[in-house]
Amino acid sequence: ARRKIVVSSLGPFPLQLRPADNQQAVDTMISHWKRELEQVLPDRPDLIVLPEACDRYPAMNKEERLSYYRFRGDKIRDFFRDVARRNRCYIAYSAAREMPDGTWRNSTLLIDRNGEIAGIYNKNYPTVGEVTEWKTLAGKEAPVFQTDFGRVGMAICFDLNFHELLERYAKQRPDLIIFSSMYHGGLMQGYGAYHCRSYFVGAIAGPENNILNPLGARVACSTNYLPRVTAAINLDYQVVHLDENWEKLEAVKKKYGRGVTVFDPGFVG
């Protein structure tokens, strides 16, 4: 598995439009994401992460949104599958999905470099409104998916507040956590990364997008001017306690020089 990879996170504000009809809604959304993707594709990222409900129109009322989602079907998903295939990258596409029984899931689909679906995560902790108004059922699994660069877990928005989910991931030792959200999460982002000992790539619609290392320290973030961030990360890492390892850390640095980085975030040992 390749260990040094490039990751991109996109976090533009949702489109504040009310398209005239469903076909226009789908076409406009695809054009929107095509423009956004064009900003990061020149960096040839291995993974692109999109925000929660990335193809939703907030201005639509419930009836309009249901009609749009049902017309949309897999059209926007298939657009992202084509982008992933043509650019040989993984894409985390987060969207509402209707099940055959009429219930809904808030899901992130991990699309691989061939445009195939490598895994699906269903939000474990939907909000009260999602459950009561949209018949969104909670996911029960905390799956970790194997990619060609490492093991990946996913979380969506409100999930980040629940230690139980992070604990399930921590036991599986993922290399990276994908976080698609409408909510930033604040200190819970760093806590999630540190608890799972995983890199963390957050895509939030509007606020800053963070890429954090397994100690919860920021590697890179988006700004108020540019709602996107790209960074190179190295998944060949190990989190160790300083006590009992001082001599080993000195020895590995002496042996490998600039080939190894010893990072200390301070104060946590």
Regions found by a protein language model. Give the residues of each.
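Cys-nucleophile CN-hydrolase/nitrilase-fold catalytic domain and related Cys-dependent amidase chemistry
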Residues: Q24-N114, H195
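Active-site catalytic loop in hydrolytic enzyme cores
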Residues: M99-Q172, L187-Y191, H195
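Short loop/turn motifs at secondary-structure junctions
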Residues: V6, D43-R44, R88, R151, ...
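Solvent-exposed loop/turn segments at secondary-structure junctions
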Residues: F13-L15, C54-Y57, R97-P100, T127, ...
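CN hydrolase (nitrilase-like) catalytic-core segments centered on the catalytic cysteine
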Residues: R72-I91, L160-F267
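Short beta-strand scaffold segments in enzyme catalytic cores
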Residues: Y93-A95, S107-L110, P143, N209-L212, ...
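Active-site-proximal beta-strand elements of phosphoester/diester hydrolases
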Residues: R2-Q23, S107, I120-N122, R151-D159, ...
